[in-house]
Amino acid sequence: MALISWMCLSARNLADEAEGVRKALETSLEAGRTRVGRIVGRDTANLSRREILCATIETVAENLTDGVISPMLYLALGGPVLGMAFKAASTLDSMIGYLNEKYRDVGWFAAKADDVWNYVPARITALLMCLAAFPLGLDGRRAFRTVVRDHANHLSPNCAWSESAAAGALGVQLGGDHEYFGQVVHKPTIGDDIRPPEGEDIRRMNRLMFVTAGLMLALVAGVAVLIYKM
């Protein structure tokens, strides 16, 4: 029960941070830049309103994998020991997993280890997001098509899976070039530019996250019951 509560709190905290960005952006562009800087690694000083919204959606989508779905999977497979091993790898990646001059040597290992841990969960997350889109009135079919087409449109082998599902479900385009530590990193776009993102898309993304997490919890519980009966 404590572990399930921990997962719920992780999703809740992520949703609260994303909602904080939405509210800050309603106040001013500068407030939005400052607030989104709490949840993204990219430089935020010159972000436009659109870029702030996209950055927030991308962050929720990416962290849905490594902050919610992956821990659920590893806790189910190996209990607290495997769950905490994953958490340690994820934390190390967040701290030093940058492929720049400063962190190149140790950062490479941290980033690659995190890629391995999240390889399977990222794909599970994308599929569950496509399914979760339907009861929310989002476009699950387009989400699936976008995942099939754009799942490789990222420097990471995992990030674009959940981001493409989010882009397709919401009908917005994510990705593109970002600036990290003063250096521009060129990234492909994800999804179709059907319409510009709006503040309400952050709320839609949060709801998509919670329903996806619920589906994963049901899946894990179902598998556990089957194993127990065997």
Named regions from a protein language model:
Residues M1-A85, A89, G97-M230:
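Hydrophobic alpha-helical transmembrane segments
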